[in-house]
Amino acid sequence: MKPIKTYDIKEEELAKTAYATIKTNKGNITLELFYKDAPQAVSNFVTLAKEGFYNGLNFHRVIAGFVAQGGCPYGTGTGGPEHRIKCEVAHNPNKHQRGSISMAHAGRDTGGSQFFLCFVDLPHLDGEHTVFGKITSAESLSVLDKIKQGDIIESVVFSPSL
């Protein structure tokens, strides 16, 4: 099994990346990242994105009324980085609501690079997957609604504020 990676990024540093914009071939999806509630998931997402990991990957799993999932380097849902991260669900108050971004995994503490965006509220996933952010605008939700399987993540950029 891949080793668990733990990030030691200070909250002040994470605050500089409090907002993410996932640039797709359908438009931009802007999210607020919950770095106080899910610091490891946010650190992992930010680190991978800044390394260019997500650039050019696709949304390999899109199920209407459920989720749009991306972040697999193979485009199949079977890949990830050479590490995994722990789930952060115990003290995370965030729920799987329409527009939430959450870590995908194949079992507790197996998340790596794959994430999903919720098309609708999915309360049955609460406590199972780490919610680490949420879409900030109706415009971004509209872009999410246009995502289809195979659509491309062009890049991910960050800012401290909107």
Swiss-Prot record:
Keyword presence, Isomerase: yes
SUPFAM superfamilies: Cyclophilin-like (SSF50891)
Top EC class, one word: isomerase
Enzyme Commission number: 5.2.1.8
Pfam families attached to this UniProt entry: Pro_isomerase (PF00160)
Domain PPIase cyclophilin-type stretches: 16-162
Biological processes, Gene Ontology terms: protein folding
Molecular function GO terms recorded: peptidyl-prolyl cis-trans isomerase activity
Catalytic function, reaction form: [protein]-peptidylproline (omega=180) = [protein]-peptidylproline (omega=0)
InterPro entries assigned to the protein according to its UniProt record, in alphabetical order: Cyclophilin-like_dom_sf (IPR029000), Cyclophilin-type_PPIase (IPR024936), Cyclophilin-type_PPIase_CS (IPR020892), Cyclophilin-type_PPIase_dom (IPR002130), Cyclophilin_A-like (IPR044666)
Record bears the keyword Nucleus: no
Function: PPIases accelerate the folding of proteins. It catalyzes the cis-trans isomerization of proline imidic peptide bonds in oligopeptides.
Family that this chain belongs to: Belongs to the cyclophilin-type PPIase family.
Protein name: Peptidyl-prolyl cis-trans isomerase
Organism of provenance: Helicobacter pylori (strain J99 / ATCC 700824) (Campylobacter pylori J99)
Gene this chain is encoded by: ppiA
